[in-house]
Curated annotation (Swiss-Prot):
PANTHER family: 23S RRNA METHYLTRANSFERASE (PTHR30544), RADICAL SAM CORE DOMAIN-CONTAINING PROTEIN (PTHR30544:SF5)
List of catalytic residues: E100 (proton acceptor), C345 (s-methylcysteine intermediate)
Co-factor requirement: [4Fe-4S] cluster
Disulfide cysteine pairs (residue numbers): C113-C345
InterPro entries found in the cross-reference section: Aldolase_TIM (IPR013785), Methyltransferase_A (IPR040072), RlmN_N (IPR048641), RNA_MTrfase_RlmN (IPR027492), rRNA_lsu_MTrfase_RlmN/Cfr (IPR004383), rSAM (IPR007197)
Gene Ontology MF: a single term: metal ion binding
Primary localization: cytoplasm
Free-text comment on the cofactor: Binds 1 [4Fe-4S] cluster. The cluster is coordinated with 3 cysteines and an exchangeable S-adenosyl-L-methionine.
Protein name (record): Probable dual-specificity RNA methyltransferase RlmN
The gene coding this protein: rlmN
Length: 356
């Protein structure tokens, strides 16, 4: 009998590594290779239901199902396909919460944008996710499933993973790091192709560095800090959490993170027309991050309902980039994908929730 079941804990197969699945099999009196078979069918074949793992003895499958063991796969409730090939999925959890995952294809790569929470509590003024409120953090299998679901939608393995969907990853550090371990070791996606984005949460950056080293052995994923403003006053207007986490304290923690991990930090900066996209803002930003081993990723705003912010003109975007480049800042502009299908973070869930 499975010890975990005797303790009354829910047993979800997705998110568990080979060793844990082998142990599970042995706790039921099955040989260890049964655990390896479950692992193969979960991660390579992408099976959704336990009864579909036909290589397992039928009696054991029935026993597992009767005792509440499940794969942990989520249900796809809606799919949007943009003209550029971007696919956004609305997935439903076992407790009927909705989360989003987005697949962004190019010729050579498939980037999957995953959510770490149901909703978000950070309240960034320009973001649709917070409009629907915060419900809870996601479990490991719910994060990993998003990658498998995008793989199914495109019939190819995602090459890159970005934790830039719904939620604040650093408010769910344990599950995020465990899911990174699973994506790396069980799905074969290299850490260097994984990015974790944060708006900044007090005391979490040093914790992230230390926990990542403990759980992953080494830190190779990229940390992306969603800065969005070059000074404290403007950041407080756009990112309410900045009121309790001053920008200089945030950057000090970034330096500490860099010292521990040795990994370059990427700064995310969403451009809002006439709000934070002026020449003086670009100059301030260059001053603010001088001395960092960093890269600035500019994001042209995707308009959402209920907010008056606008997307800057291409001329204003190019001017902002030129100022940064003239100051020696490594900068890129994220290509806007899925604009015709509400691909901005949180839009699909927000609309679905309002309809319900």
């Amino acid at each position: 009998m499975n010890i975990s079941l005797l303790e009354g804990k829910k047993v979800v197969l997705l998110g568990q590594n080979v060793a844990k699945l082998e142990k599970l099999a042995q706790e039921y009196g099955e040989p260890a290779f049964r655990g390896r078979q479950i692992h193969e069918w979960l991660y390579q074949k992408g099976v959704r239901k336990l009864e579909e793992i036909s290589v397992l003895p039928k009696l054991w499958r029935t026993t597992l199902s009767d005792q509440g063991v499940c794969t942990g796969r989520l249900e796809e409730v809606k799919r949007l396909v943009a003209n550029d090939g971007t696919i956004k999925l609305l997935l439903e959890t076992s407790d009927r919460e909705s989360i989003e995952a987005v697949g962004i294809p190019t010729n050579s790569r498939l980037t999957t944008c995953v959510s770490s929470q149901v909703g978000c509590s950070m309240g960034c003024r320009f973001c649709a996710t917070g409009k629907g409120g915060f419900q809870r953090s996601l479990e490991v299998h719910e994060i990993v499933d998003q990658v498998l679901s995008i793989r199914e939608a495109f019939d190819r393995r995602p090459s890159h993973i970005v934790f830039m969907g719904m939620g604040e990853p650093l408010l769910n550090i344990e599950s995020v790091l465990e899911s990174i371990s699973c994506l790396n070791n069980d799905l074969g996606i290299g850490q260097r192709r994984i990015t974790v984005s944060t708006v900044g949460v007090v005391n979490t950056l040093p914790q992230l560095a230390e926990l990542a080293l403990a759980k992953l052995g080494r830190v190779q994923f990229t940390l992306a800090l969603s800065l969005h403003a070059p000074n404290q006053h403007l950041r407080e207007m756009l990112v309410p959490s900045a009121k309790v986490y001053p920008i200089q304290d945030l950057l000090s923690d970034c330096r500490h993170y860099l010292d521990i991990t040795g990994r370059r930090i990427s700064f995310e900066y969403i451009l809002l027309a006439t709000v934070n996209d002026k020449v003086e803002h670009a100059e301030e930003l260059a001053d603010l991050i001088s001395g960092f081993q960093s890269h600035v990723n500019l994001i042209a705003y995707n308009p959402i309902d209920e907010e008056d912010y606008q997307r800057p003109s291409l001329a204003r975007i190019n001017r902002f980039m030129t100022v940064l480049q003239s100051r020696g800042v490594a900068v890129s502009l994220r290509a806007s994908r899925g604009l015709d299908q509400d691909a901005a973070c949180g839009q699909l869930r927000h609309q679905h929730t309002r309809l319900d």
